[in-house]
Design a protein with these regions (language model features):
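Active-site-proximal loop/turn and secondary-structure-junction residues that shape catalytic pockets
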Residues: 16-18, 45-47, 73-74, 118-120, ...
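N-terminal pre-domain/capping segments
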Residues: 1-100, 106, 178, 262-275
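Active-site acidic/histidine proton-transfer and metal-coordination neighborhood
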Residues: 24, 84-182
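Short Asp/Glu-rich motifs
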Residues: 52-53, 79, 124-125, 162, ...
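Alpha-helical scaffolding segments of alpha/beta enzyme cores, especially the outer helices
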Residues: 28-32, 54-58, 62, 93-107, ...
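Short, basic/glycine-rich phosphate-binding loops at helix/coil junctions
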Residues: 76-80, 111-118, 211-212
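Histidine-acidic metal/acid-base catalytic patches
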Residues: 1-34, 163, 167-185, 189-275
Length: 275
């Protein structure tokens, strides 16, 4: 990965178009990321088994980008997957899909994000938590065997009834005791679930290798009300060296939103001068 010009490597989550090499809009978006010094990208891919990951990485390399994570949300939506579903058939199919993801990513230094794939709100939240834990136990064993990192995103209660807070997610990772299992803090979700996001980050700093950043309104950083400077100070104080990853909804369009967000982020993410 190209050295970052920022305090932390800067990445973004996007959807991979089927015609990514010939999609002019997508190529222009990647050029803009290159201009601003992004070094990593997480990709939502509807059917990961149908793509050529080597070709995707070669394509991204032309824009100084490395594929760091497979974001499984689009796949889960496309195929109706849920790791906490009360339907054992759906859960089994979802676990099998995760095993397939792991097999495809083995040896590529690409992790898997489990967010939407956790499953949505449920009438029986206690059962959903138990079922999700059982699903993750099976996935974690396969992940360790194949040496592929799996990251569970702490998402708010309105999107899922499992792994909502950073603490809850970290506790489950502790219980499963697997070096290839991590948590994924996200500033949007923390703004809803945490009493103090910075305390949550400090307390569980040994459990995450990536941080998602989006504003309180789910737009890109700088387009809402969150002050990201204390967040980045907290990460710097703990010697965090992983990526910070923009994941959010568009307010206007990609170009306008990236320009606006980077006008803010280039200030709060700038490297401190050597002393």
């Amino acid at each position: 990965m190209k050295p970052s010009i920022y305090r932390f490597p800067l990445a973004i989550q996007m959807v991979l178009p089927d015609d990514y090499r010939h999609n002019q809009a997508f190529n222009q978006e990647l050029k803009l990321l290159q201009h601003y010094g992004f070094t990593g990208i997480e990709l939502n891919i509807a059917n990961i088994e149908a793509v050529n990951l080597d070709d995707i990485q070669r394509f991204l390399n032309a824009y100084d980008l490395v594929l760091t994570m497979f974001a499984s949300g689009l796949t889960a939506k496309t195929h109706g997957l849920s790791l906490s579903s009360p339907d054992v058939t759906i859960r089994s199919r979802s676990v099998a899909a995760c095993h397939q993801f792991i097999d495809l990513l083995q040896g590529r230094h690409i992790g898997i994000i489990i967010g939407f794939l956790k499953g949505g709100p449920a009438k029986d939240a206690a059962r959903a938590k138990t079922d999700f834990r059982d699903s993750m136990r099976q996935i974690a064993v396969h992940a360790q065997a194949k040496k592929v990192h799996v990251i569970i995103e702490a998402t708010n209660r309105y999107e899922s009834c499992v792994a909502n807070t950073v603490e809850e997610t970290a506790r489950m990772v502790d219980d499963l005791d697997n070096p290839y299992l991590h948590i994924l803090p996200d500033t949007f979700h923390m703004n809803i679930e945490e009493i103090d996001a910075n305390t949550a980050l400090r307390t569980h700093q040994d459990k995450f290798i990536s941080v998602h950043i989006s504003d309180n309104n789910r737009h890109y950083p700088g387009l809402g009300a969150i002050d990201f400077h204390p967040v980045f100070q907290t990460l710097a104080a703990m010697d965090y060296n992983g990526p910070v990853v923009i994941e959010g909804n568009l307010r206007k369009d990609f170009s306008a939103d990236i320009h606006a967000s980077m006008a803010y982020l280039t200030t709060v993410l700038k490297k401190e001068p050597d002393v």
